[in-house]
Structures are given as structure tokens and as C-alpha cells.
Amino acid sequence: MKSERIPVKSFSADNGFIGKMQKLVREEVLPYQYNILNDAIPGVEKSHAIENIRLAAEKLRGKDVKPDEFYGMVFQDSDVAKWIEAAAYALAAGEDPELEKAVDETIQLYGASQHEDGYVDSYFTVKCPDKMWTNICDAHELYLSLIHI
């Protein structure tokens, strides 16, 4: 049996369960996640995910960023990348100028954290640049590099 791809815009889920879930994700979940990634929700532990990417971008622009300014998990860049991906799917299904602006700003920041050779990983850029590609088994570098493809 041959399968055929269906373009995202060819599918409409305006009604029913899927439509309700898409609306919930677009209007509630993605903005909430964006605020979590930006440490903008009081009373919730800071993720520092986007701040770490900002620090990496600043370091690459020559700013004196200290290794201990990085906070969080080694793999957090993927949380931001996956948020961008989810938001892109939501935007493919319908316009949302506010979400689009947040995505554009996040992509711009992400791009500013990329080394000239294409390397992107805020943990190693900020915390321990001398350890890049030394522990691909445990440090999520290979995973993060594939997330960006």
C-alpha cells in the first residue's frame, strides 16, 4: 500500500477534538511555554533556557560572560528548538501575529548564538567551550546538533 503525504495546510481541524486541541495549544500552551522558557512566570522555578542562549550570543559577540552565569540542564537548547517547531506548526495552521513575533525573535536570538562553523550549544559556549565534542555520549551535543537539522 502506497502512502501519500498530505500538506499541513490541506488538513483542517476547525471543529471536533483535534480542532479544540490545536486552538488550546496555539492560544494557551505555546504562550505559557514561551513565558516559562523566558522565566516570566512568578513562583515557577526559572528554566533559564532562553537566557542561556542569550548569554551564548553575547559571548560570541565578545561580551565577558562568566561560566557560572549558565543555569540549567545541558540539553535545554532543545526545549527552545522544540518550542519553535511547535509554534511553526501552529502558525502553519493559522495566523497569530503575536506568536509569529515571538518565534521570529527567538529564531533571531538562536541564530546569534551560532558559531561561525555552525555549532550551536549554549551550555558548551558559555560553561565550558574547551570541552566541545568531548562527551557526545552523555552531554547531548549530538542530539542537539541533530535537532537543528
Task: Kindly give the residue locations of the regions a language model identified.
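Conserved small/polar residues in nucleotide/adenosyl-binding loops
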Residues: I147-I149
